[in-house]
Amino acid sequence: NSTFDNRFSGSDAVADKVESEHGITVRNSDKSDLGAEIGRFMEVYNEAWEKNWGFIPMTDHEIDHLAKSFKPVVIPELVPFAEKDGQIIAFGLVLPDLNSALVGNRSGGLLRFLAKTFWLLKTQRLRRCRIILLGILPEWRGRGVDAMLYHWIRTKAGEQNTSWGDAGWSVEDNPSMKAGLEKM
């Protein structure tokens, strides 16, 4: 086990408890069905984020643009969906930290950056990741679904040889997200 895995092993029991008590399952996103996955993601995103400071619902154009931009770097195991009876109730969006691909690219050459990024992604040598978004439907908050998603992300990131994660984009005034991250 890596240090990453050992530090957070307590989340296993929480995830198991949430699954057995509530019948919630977590699955990977499906890159081959990207359009439908984005639709499912947006249903939860708009409801989960509507009360966050500064939230503005994304337009269809923005969603399409983001999906096209993220598709080359998305690792399906790091974009989990939590489901209850086949309905999405929560999601996570974790992306590789591409800053490591920028290191050594002082020339600023786009082709070199893209080649290095592609190589790092294919050889699983990106050791860092960033939690970009986490969204849970309001009626499922406080029931451990966040712990279940964090557990999934931690486990799958470890399988990708990731040893470090960052949630620096988390809104400072989101006590639920802060508490979940601090418990990890």
Where on the chain are the PLM-derived regions?
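Conserved beta-strand-loop-alpha-helix junction that forms the acyl-donor binding cleft
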Residues: 1-2, 136-141, 167-177
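Acyl-donor-binding surface of acyltransferase catalytic domains
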Residues: 1-25
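Short catalytic/ligand-binding loop motif for oxyanion handling, primarily in non-cytosolic enzymes
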Residues: 4-8, 90, 100-101, 176
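Residues at or immediately flanking beta-strands
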Residues: 25, 54, 164-166
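A conserved beta-strand-loop-helix scaffold within acyl/acetyltransferase catalytic domains
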Residues: 28-136
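Conserved acetyl-CoA-binding loop-helix of GNAT-fold acetyltransferases
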Residues: 128, 132-136, 141-157
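Conserved GNAT acetyl-CoA-binding A-motif
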Residues: 128-129, 157-171
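Conserved active-site tyrosine of GNAT-family acetyltransferases
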Residues: 180-181
